[in-house]
Amino acid sequence: LAENVRLTDLVGELEVANARRQATKDTLEHNAELLLIQIQGGSPLTPARYDYARRVARATELRDKIASAKWVDPQLLDEYTSLYLAELGIASSREYFFARIPVKDQLDQTYYKWAECLMNGNWSVYFRTIDGEIVGSYENVAGSGPPNYEFRQDVNDKLREDIVAALTSARPEDYREKVAILQEKAKIYDPKSDLQKNY
């Protein structure tokens, strides 16, 4: 009889342990899914070290790894924690970088220009073309639902001044050298340049 009671207690303990294991796994799986959604909802225009596609792929891989795991081990929990903390760092980052972005001319034709950019966390990017002609922001214009990021050039004068001031204060010391290199690269794509006329 004592053996029967002992075995019954063990079965009960195993059921409780299994329920706890499943609840922990479900919670981590849910959190990994939320993290993936947060990354997908962030700005795709980022400096190379915060590559959007690589971050989405890493979060997707982690979510799938958690889903296929039988239990949550410390290594899996550490992997989630490091990814979560990295995304928190990106969300508060203001980083200066250069990018070749689509802009529109007076005839509403789209073409690409090099621009200096300032990342405002993972929700927007300020930009100014290196020739200084176009100033604007890249942000989510969707009121609700899936994110829809667009380049906005039609900013008012006050916002334009604020964007230029933010970009100017974020410039690194070697800013002028990088701009000179990008201006040379821009000549390759300029249809009015001698290089394009020759070819």
Model-derived segments and spans:
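Soluble extracytoplasmic domains of inner/organellar membrane proteins
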Residues: L62-A115, M119-W123
